[in-house]
Each structure stands twice: as structure tokens, then as C-alpha cells.
Amino acid sequence: MNAKEKIEELLEASEDGTITAAQVTEAGLHRSVLQEFVKSGEMYRFGRGLYVRSSAWEDDFYLLQRKYGRGIYSHDTALYLLGYSDRTPAKYTMTFPKGYNAPSLKQENLIIKRVVPENYEFGRIEIESPSGNPIRVYDLERTLCDILRGSGSDIQTVSYTHLRAHETEA
């Protein structure tokens, strides 16, 4: 099996059209093979070590979380993903544990929140992105608390969201 066939096999196994440089190395291939795929237009580089098949449906929520594995969608982005807001956020909000530092985070179109490591996992759930891929997000209760605790929150929006959530549960 040649390098191209191995890459194709890895992409087929991934189901989402993504592949990492680490997977290529584990398969016994040199990472330069990925650059050949990028040059030919069959793939593009989404971030450091993360490559996506050009024909794959691009899911920003999923790809950003693959790129920043410690990030959890929170605040207004979580409200949107949980179905309690009809406004697509202009910038996605992700929460990271304090001490996590990825220099490229500042270059993304993200609002970055930090939390002490003891509270980082609290309220974390896994849901499907709008494109059907698994993503991590904070649950509704954690999201509402985070929004209320933050500065400049719109109390009417949060109250409306909370009431709407309880109406759907009843």
C-alpha cells in the first residue's frame, strides 16, 4: 500500500474528513505526505497538525474543538448550541482552564474565558454540533450562571432564556 492509499484509508476511517499529523506518523508515514495533499488541493491545513479533506463539510464548531482540545463552548455560544438562542454568535465563546495557553488562540475569532481547574469540568456535556459532529458544551444551568456572573450581562435575555427552558421542560 502506497502513501496515498494509506492517507485515503485514514481519512475514510475518520468519518469526518479530518486527519492529524500524529495519525500519519503512527501509520508509519512521513508528515511531508500531508503537504503533498495540500499542494494538490485534496486537503487543507486547518491548524497545527490538523488537516481536512477539501470535499468535507466544514463544521467550525467541531474543527475548533479538535484544534483546541481543552476548549468547551460556553456563554452565548452554548445558549445557541443548546437551542435557547436563535442568534448565531458573531464570535464563538470557549472556556479553558487557567494555565492553558495556546499562542494561536489570540488569532482565532474567539472570545476566550478562563476558569479555575477545579470548576472546569462542572456542567460539561457532549452534544451534536449543527452538522452532527460531537462537541463539548456547558449545560444550561452552568451557562446561565456563567452569563450572570460575568460583566455586562443582559439580565432580561438571561431571564427569558431561563423561563423558556422551564416552559419546554414542563
Language-model features, listed with the residues they occupy:
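Nucleic-acid-binding surface
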Residues: 18-23, 46, 50-156
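Single conserved hydrophobic/aromatic residue that forms the stacking wall/gate
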Residues: 162-170
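A small-molecule sensor/coupling module
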Residues: 159
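Short amphipathic alpha-helical interaction segments
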Residues: 29-36
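Short amphipathic alpha-helical interface segments
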Residues: 2-17
